[in-house]
UniProtKB/Swiss-Prot annotation:
Organism (species): Macrophomina phaseolina (strain MS6) (Charcoal rot fungus)
Keyword Transcription: yes
Organism lineage: Eukaryota, Fungi, Dikarya, Ascomycota, Pezizomycotina
Gene3D superfamilies listed in its UniProt record: Zn(2)-C6 fungal-type DNA-binding domain (4.10.240.10)
Pfam families referenced in this protein's UniProt entry, alphabetically: Fungal_trans (PF04082), Zn_clus (PF00172)
Name of the protein in question: Zn(2)-C6 fungal-type transcription factor mpsB
Gene Ontology terms: biological process: DNA-templated transcription
Region (Disordered): 625-645
InterPro entries named in the record: Sec_Metabolite_Reg, Transcription_factor_dom_fun, Zn2-C6_fun-type_DNA-bd_sf, Zn2Cys6_DnaBD
GO cellular component: nucleus
Function: Transcription factor; part of the gene cluster that mediates the biosynthesis of macrophasetins, 3-decalinoyltetramic acids (DTAs) which feature a tetramate (pyrrolidine-2,4-dione) unit connected to a decalin fragment and that have potent bioactivities.
Length: 740
């Protein structure tokens, strides 16, 4: 991409050469179309970039005069469209004129490439990959226009605007810290009884505390600190302040106050400032003892309260990743005999956590992950309790069995799943071509990995989990959501292609099924995080990362629903019972999600956007000719509705037998059996070596969407009743604290 300056330069102005010639640095005869474009078969895309400062000189052949630029955003939008048109013309052959199905060898040839999205909003340039929910929404013209002025959206809610104004980003990244001393830091420490309670709150609330801090060792060092505070390493003091700051955060979440107290907020910020001062005073870039642990807890302090995605937190993770690699966390400690067994095991725990943080935050901001697993060989930590070993151990004990539900068991299970998820994101963000066979291999690997999760961490119905801790239930939900998010990203590229090519029906079914299940989790989490719910004590764990998963799900379902409405408008919609049921499930899921997003629209910018997206999509669905939900479950409310939804979810064949999903490597009998159950075509019927290249990423037929949406008037959302008559909606107004 080239940035065109408005100042005069010595070379010829860019507007006298076509876009193709400019990009390829070729000669141009300035005709319309130019001979270069004609020779390359790009006559229809031969375009001249307009210049506001200079008049366009006419060539021998007349060409249309360019319209004046209406602003930098219009020019960028125009340039993006021209570049995408050029890419499509170069990389893809025209579709065959006949209606015959394409052969398996060219299945991917007509799939559009995905560049992602570059936006300039609020004087900020931002890029997200094609997998990000913002890129998906960009394909719907009326939604793109609706959110084009991000300033208006940011100021739509005074409460949200106020919250945004208060947050200035992680102070560690911006410096400007006043000089401080050890004495002033120690003077800010609360009294011993208060500190004891906050430390206890941290270890009893942070269920993954063991992956960062070894509890018994910390308590022993904690006692030593009170005997001689002035002799304690400054970085350990920073670790202590991070622990009491997180304990303060957990304590405040349990008070359930509706309006935040400035005094409580200032106390938490004061503790956070002390963490930063200790990091700076201890020169954290030298990565001395306790530096990685303190940085990881500092990230938690910035991440947990965030209602929306914060790119600063992703930058923080980048710092942690590079510092960890600087001291060799990515290489297994067994290569270095000087590292003691206790230190080696804690390094493995730290690295497993860091790898997950990297993939989690990178996906959230729509960028490739930073850790390259090809240069890493750190093995997973052993399934041990903190009480099983200490810093004096000579040989580590063997791992506990998978039946022992430890936090490290969950860490390892999620790490295995995230490894496959990382392979999927690498595939979809790569610029190298791939094949549909590779996609299906990853699909099988993903299902096999989920099937290998220990039984204690497999998803269970809530009615079967009422005697278990909330953290165990949440861990199962998190693992299942990661699985379905991976399915969405892996198969999303083929979502719309399946509407015209039955060869991709398995991908469409997988993608829609996964998105619906993610929204079912959103509904369960919203209900059970209310006071008195099974998960109320863990509602602080519903972070912006989960909201990103919910946003991804609603955009996928919205696009598929819009495709059904488009076919219905042309009388081309196939009304099979399964398709009708799937569409009703989509509408039902989007309606419930819409009401959940409304609860936090005043405190979250992303929630406000999600609610607006669903307003538009559901309004169009209500006015279309497609059938609306009609199910006995819609007449239920409260616990009955949750129970019915859960029963429908848990009894689905795909959930009970995920590892037997259609796979080209499986036997024909198994593939046919499962695919028949799912009513989808088996990929084994058409999975041959695909020689045609497919550009990476996931995208949709934007031209099709644009032509459909731009010809319609956006309804007045403020005066329209978007609720379907057969659906039940919560009326108690709970959830205003934005726990989801």
């Amino acid at each position: 991409m080239y940035i065109v300056s408005s100042k005069k330069v010595s070379r010829a102005p860019l507007h006298v050469a076509s876009l193709c010639v400019t990009l390829h640095r070729l000669k141009c005869d300035r005709n319309q179309p130019c001979s270069t474009c004609s020779h390359r078969g790009l006559s229809f895309s031969c375009t001249y970039v307009a210049s506001a400062a200079n008049s366009v000189r006419k060539a021998d052949q007349s060409r249309p005069s360019p319209r004046p630029a209406a602003g930098i955003q219009d020019r960028i939008t125009q340039l993006e469209g021209l570049v995408l048109t050029l890419m499509h013309s170069v990389n893809h052959k025209p579709a065959p004129s006949t209606g015959a199905p394409e052969s398996a060898s060219v299945l991917d040839a007509d799939l559009p490439a995905s560049f992602g999205r570059i936006s300039l909003e609020n004087d900020e340039t931002r890029y997200v990959s094609g997998d990000h929910w913002i890129s998906i929404l960009d394909g719907i013209a009326e939604l793109k226009d609706h959110f084009e002025d991000d300033n208006l959206n940011a100021g739509a809610s005074p409460a949200a605007g106020a919250a945004t104004a208060e947050y200035q980003g992680p102070k560690l990244l911006f410096g400007c810290h006043s000089p401080t001393t050890r004495e002033s830091i120690l003077a800010s420490l609360p009294q011993r009884p208060v500190t004891d309670r906050l430390v206890s709150k941290y270890f009893n609330s942070m269920d993954m505390a063991s992956s960062i801090i070894h509890g018994p060792t910390f308590i022993r060092e904690y006692e030593t600190f009170w005997l001689a505070p002035s002799e304690t390493p400054i970085m350990w003091i920073g670790l202590l302040f991070a622990v009491i700051a997180l304990g303060t955060h957990f304590q405040q979440r349990e008070t359930h106050f509706i309006h935040p107290s400035p005094q409580r907020h200032s106390v938490l910020e004061a503790y956070k400032d002390k963490v930063i001062e200790c990091l700076v005073l201890g020169k954290y870039t030298k990565v001395g003892p306790y530096a990685i642990e303190t940085l990881m807890l500092y990230f938690s302090l910035e991440h947990l309260p965030a209602a929306d995605t914060r790119v600063d937190n992703w930058i923080l993770v980048g710092i942690i990743v590079r510092l960890a690699m600087r001291v060799g966390y990515h290489r297994d400690p067994s290569h270095t005999p000087q590292i003691k067994p206790f230190q080696a095991e804690m390094r493995r725990r730290h690295w497993a956590t860091i790898v997950q943080l990297d993939l989690m935050t990178s996906t959230q901001v729509g960028l490739p992950r930073m850790v390259n697993e090809a240069v890493c060989d750190t093995v997973e930590p052993r399934n041990l309790l903190d009480q099983d070993f200490d810093d004096q151990v000579v040989d580590l004990p063997p791992s506990r069995p998978d039946s022992d539900m430890t936090s490290i068991l969950y860490l390892n299970a999620r790490n295995k799943l995230m490894t496959v998820f990382g392979m999927i994101t690498d595939l979809t963000t790569s610029t190298f071509p791939t094949s549909y066979r590779h996609v299906m291999r990853l699909d099988r690997t993903l299902h096999n990995t989920v099937a290998a999760i220990p039984s204690g961490l497999q998803l269970k119905a809530l009615s079967q989990s009422i005697t278990e801790p909330s953290e165990t239930i949440l861990r199962r939900i998190y693992l299942d959501m990661t699985f379905h998010k991976a399915r969405c990203i892996l198969h999303r590229k083929y979502l719309t292609a399946a509407q015209v090519n039955a060869s991709y029906i398995y991908s469409r079914t997988s993608c829609i099924d996964a998105a619906v299940r993610i929204l079912q989790h959103q509904d369960v989490l919203f209900r059970e995080c209310q006071p008195g719910g099974l998960l109320h004590s863990g509602n602080w764990k519903i972070t912006s990362v989960l909201n990103h998963d919910f946003l991804l799900a609603i955009t996928i379902l919205s696009l598929d629903l819009n495709g059904a409405m488009e076919l219905a408008s042309k009388s081309q919609l196939i009304e099979t019972p399964m398709e009708q049921q799937r569409r009703e499930n989509i509408i039902r899921s989007l309606n419930r999600s819409y009401n959940i997003w409304l609860q936090s629209a005043n405190t979250s910018r992303e929630a406000r956007k999600a609610a607006e997206v669903l307003r538009i999509v559901l309004a169009k669905a209500q006015n279309s000719s497609i059938s609306t939900p009609s199910h006995d479950q819609d007449d239920l409310d409260g616990e009955a509705a949750t129970e019915a939804t859960e029963s429908e979810y848990m009894n689905s064949p795909l959930t009970l037998q995920p590892f037997l999903a259609c796979d080209p490597g499986a036997s024909t009998a198994i593939g046919t059996n499962i695919c028949t159950t799912l009513d989808v075509a088996s990929p084994s019927d058409y999975m041959e070596d695909l020689n045609d290249n497919v550009t990476s990423g996931v995208d949709f037929d934007w031209d099709n969407w644009d032509s459909h949406f731009r010809g319609q008037n956006t309804p007045n959302m403020s005066t329209m009743d978007l609720r379907f008559p057969n659906l039940d909606y919560p009326t108690d107004g709970r959830g205003s604290d934005g726990c989801i």
